[in-house]
């Protein structure tokens, strides 16, 4: 199962009183926009009980074109990583 932003908005409408569907959609969109902009500015995000979003700089490295076998460089880049908190890991393990 995949949880979409629309489904998150529906959950907000169901669980929080006096929240309209449009307000819930806006809240969800603002939440993710804040995460995007914070990461884009180079800052890390720590959500207690959930996990950490961290930025990692990966250096250039050699790669290979799978079709031709030709060596090509994979450019340096910045990636986002997520590390789940112990609490989240425990909850996931409990439900498995």
From Swiss-Prot:
Protein family per UniProt: Belongs to the bacterial histone-like protein family.
The keyword DNA-binding is annotated on this UniProt entry: yes
NCBIfam families with a match to the protein in the record: himA (TIGR00987), PRK00285.1 (NF001401)
Annotated coiled-coil segments of the chain: none
The protein's name in its UniProt record: Integration host factor subunit alpha
Main function: This protein is one of the two subunits of integration host factor, a specific DNA-binding protein that functions in genetic recombination as well as in transcriptional and translational control.
Keyword Transcription regulation: yes
PROSITE patterns: HISTONE_LIKE
GO molecular function: DNA binding; structural constituent of chromatin
Stored InterPro entries: Hist_DNA-bd (IPR000119), Histone-like_DNA-bd_CS (IPR020816), IHF-like_DNA-bd_dom_sf (IPR010992), IHF_alpha (IPR005684)
GO CC terms of this entry: cytosol
Keywords: DNA recombination, DNA-binding, Transcription, Transcription regulation, Translation regulation
UniProt GO BP: DNA recombination; positive regulation of metabolic process; regulation of DNA-templated transcription; regulation of translation
CDD domains: IHF_A
PANTHER family tied to this protein: DNA-BINDING PROTEIN HU, INTEGRATION HOST FACTOR SUBUNIT ALPHA
Subunit structure as annotated in this protein's UniProt entry: Heterodimer of an alpha and a beta chain.
SUPFAM superfamilies: IHF-like DNA-binding proteins
Lineage, top ranks: Bacteria, Pseudomonadati, Pseudomonadota, Betaproteobacteria, Neisseriales
């Amino acid at each position: 199962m995949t949880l979409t932003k629309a489904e998150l908005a529906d959950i907000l409408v169901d669980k929080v009183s006096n929240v309209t569907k449009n307000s819930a959609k806006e809240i969800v969109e603002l939440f993710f926009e804040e995460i995007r902009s914070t990461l884009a500015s180079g800052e890390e995000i720590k959500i207690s009980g959930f996990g950490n979003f961290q930025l990692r700089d990966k250096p250039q490295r050699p790669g290979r074109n799978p079709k031709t076998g030709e060596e090509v460089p994979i450019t340096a880049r910045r990636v986002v990583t997520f590390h789940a908190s112990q609490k989240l890991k425990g909850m996931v393990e409990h439900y498995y």
